[in-house]
């Protein structure tokens, strides 16, 4: 018997400082409605909430805080960092997401900033492979559990929708039957039962 959970996988939101905020609100409203209808067990945002990394506006913070609060009102929401959420050359500096999650102080909104394992219920474990903490990437400590890697970057051995190969990045050694590689990540065409590690790409 397989442990089944419903995961809503989001990535690359790219909230800009001032542009497109009316469009974001409209899309976020439709997203909240769809998520409320689908009732996921967990929502995962795999990187790039921000667009401009370090030069951020009050409007960005307001939009991002409202977005995460809206997701947290629907289901447990797990957030990881992407390359647009901070400067990879100065990883000792604060990122664009941590202050928002800390200010929200919502137990339903969790930021996985560092690499490591995040156990859910029913033997399911998210393994965060943070691009800001590559020295601490680890293989699953219990291969008997369902291990799902959270990673913002290219997946080694895959191709873009234009046919270009990804040459480095997360190693996902699970055959992903019923999926196809698309520009924004992995599209699931049918329910997927995972026996080996799976990488959710941002």
Which residues fall in each region the model found?
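His/Asp/Glu-rich metal-coordinating catalytic cores
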Residues: 55-201
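N-terminal active-site segment of His-dependent metallophosphoesterases
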Residues: 1-67, 73
């Amino acid at each position: 018997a397989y442990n089944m959970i419903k995961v809503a996988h989001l990535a690359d939101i790219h909230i800009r400082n001032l542009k497109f905020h009316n469009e974001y609100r409209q899309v976020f409203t439709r997203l909240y409605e769809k998520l409320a209808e689908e009732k996921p067990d967990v929502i995962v945002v795999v990187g790039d909430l921000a667009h401009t990394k370090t030069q951020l506006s009050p409007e960005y913070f307001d939009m991002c805080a409202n977005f995460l609060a809206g997701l947290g009102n629907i289901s447990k929401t797990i957030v990881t960092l992407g390359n647009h959420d901070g400067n990879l050359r100065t990883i000792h500096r604060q990122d664009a997401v941590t202050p928002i999650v800390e200010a929200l102080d919502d137990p339903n909104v969790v930021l996985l900033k560092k690499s490591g394992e995040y156990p859910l219920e029913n033997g399911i474990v998210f393994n965060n492979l943070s691009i800001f903490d590559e020295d601490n990437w680890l293989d699953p400590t219990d291969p008997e559990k369902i291990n799902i890697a959270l990673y913002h970057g290219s997946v080694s051995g895959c191709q873009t929708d234009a046919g270009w190969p990804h040459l480095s990045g997360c190693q996902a050694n699970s055959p992903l039957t019923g999926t196809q590689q698309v520009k924004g990540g992995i599209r699931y065409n049918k329910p997927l039962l995972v026996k080996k590690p799976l990488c959710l790409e941002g």
